[in-house]
UniProtKB/Swiss-Prot annotation:
L-citrulline binds at Y87, N123, R127, S175, E259, Y271. Its EC number is 6.3.4.5. This is Argininosuccinate synthase. One of its GO terms (molecular function) is ATP binding. It comes from Corynebacterium jeikeium (strain K411).
Length: 398
């Protein structure tokens, strides 16, 4: 009986060619796993049939949209997850979910190995392989693109030589990864840092300069979870999809950044994440109202480390699990409504309300009704600056 290899199948050129290559080079049967993460585009049944046409003995499609939203996007919202303060971890949070379902498929279908189509330059090889090391350490890992130095030209030539049906051509300029949380675009002419993105780079967002009327939206949260938009109850997935549509129509969520990859190189990336960025900005605004000052300050550092852990492929690490527990504990009072305006590529918060708010109007106002006892301030200022005052006195004496 032949060994079985479970392949993470995207439907693209590299993983389509990998089916035949693994079957020939490893004398193995290939089981393809494709995950619906709300990426849109090609119908998943078309993707499944392509895998079978390329030689897979089985092709499995998993509808993981709600799971992705609830178990991967939602923790990112609670952690205000932004790598390098910009990137909302579009690809990074999807990889551990793919790993989970591939490990399940290997167990169910008798797989002895798993395979992916990642290159040796990217972060995803780490995310996949460290993920498997944590969830299914006995599985062999096959990485033909990386380990056999595949190029696009070599993959196309192999497909033509072996009669593999592919629709992709050498004219496709970009490498694209997308899901409901966002879209990542790289390579092609974008590798020259001076080249500005052209209109065809974007798909999730409209041109911010088109002059649409502003869109005002109210996002409601309960314990850090988005539960309603403009008063209408939504699931997490529905919240992301609705804000992808509305924020995307306003050109919100475009990023053009040079990113520090885990492997040590810098890479230019174009991202579109209208729903993700809108939800994170709204969540940050509500935390500013409901989370105590010292806790909020400390959480910002935890959020940054959480983002680093996830970006670096350590979703399953003990540290990341501990960070999850801390972050969840901070969300008990993050309940309320944030009103914001989406317009011309920008997000402007213009309203906040919460029954858990720490904002006290009578303490904050400078007008009549002020209940803040300003006589306490003098002593507070003296004590607050005492240690630095003593140090300054010493330094001046020397």
């Amino acid at each position: 009986m032949k060994d079985r290899v479970v392949l993470a199948y995207s439907g693209g050129l590299d993983t389509t060619v990998a089916i035949s290559w693994i079957a020939k080079e490893r004398n193995a049967e290939v089981v393809c796993v494709s995950i619906d993460l709300g990426q849109g585009g090609e119908d998943m049944e078309t993707v499944r049939q392509r895998a079978l046409g390329a030689g897979a003995v089985e092709s499995i499609v998993v509808d993981a949209r709600d799971e992705f939203a609830n178990d991967y996007c939602l923790p990112t919202i609670k952690a205000n997850g932004m790598y390098m303060k910009e990137y909302p971890l579009v690809s990074a949070i999807s990889r551990p979910l793919i790993v989970k379902h591939m490990a399940d498929a290997a167990k169910e279908h008798g797989g002895t190995a798993v395979a992916h189509g990642c290159t040796g330059k990217g972060n995803d090889q780490v995310r996949f392989e460290v993920g498997f090391a944590n969830t299914a350490p006995d599985l062999e890992i096959i990485a033909p693109v990386r380990d056999y130095a595949w190029t696009r030209e070599k993959a196309i030539a192999f497909a033509e030589e072996n009669g593999i049906p592919i629709e992709q051509s050498k004219s496709s300029p970009f490498s694209i990864d997308q899901n409901v949380w966002g879209r990542a675009v790289e390579t092609g002419f974008l590798e020259d840092l001076w080249n500005a993105p052209t209109k065809d780079v974007y798909a999730y967002t409209e041109d911010p300069g088109l002059g649409q009327a502003p869109d005002e939206v109210i996002i409601s949260f309960e314990s850090g979870v988005p539960v309603a938009i403009d008063g209408k109850k939504v699931t997490v997935l529905e919240a992301i999809e609705e804000l992808n549509r509305r924020a995307g129509a306003q050109g919100v969520g475009r990023l053009d950044m040079v990113e520090d990859r885990l492997v040590g190189i810098k890479s230019r990336e174009i991202y579109e994440a209208p729903g993700a960025i809108t939800l994170i900005r709204a969540h940050e605004a509500l935390e500013a109202v409901t989370v105590e000052r010292e806790l909020a300050r400390y959480k910002r550092g935890i959020d940054a480390e959480w983002s680093n852990q996830v970006y670096d492929g350590l979703w399953f690490s003990p540290l990341k699990r501990s960070l999850d527990a801390f972050i969840d504990s901070t969300q008990a009072h993050v309940t309320g409504d944030i009103r914001l305006v989406l317009h011309a590529g920008s997000i402007t918060v213009n309203g906040r309300r919460s029954g858990k708010s720490l904002y006290d109007f009578n303490l904050a106002t400078y007008d009549e009704g002020d209940s803040f006892d300003q006589s306490m301030a003098r002593g507070f200022v003296e004590l607050h600056g005492l240690s630095s005052k003593i140090a300054a006195k010493r330094d001046l004496a020397n």
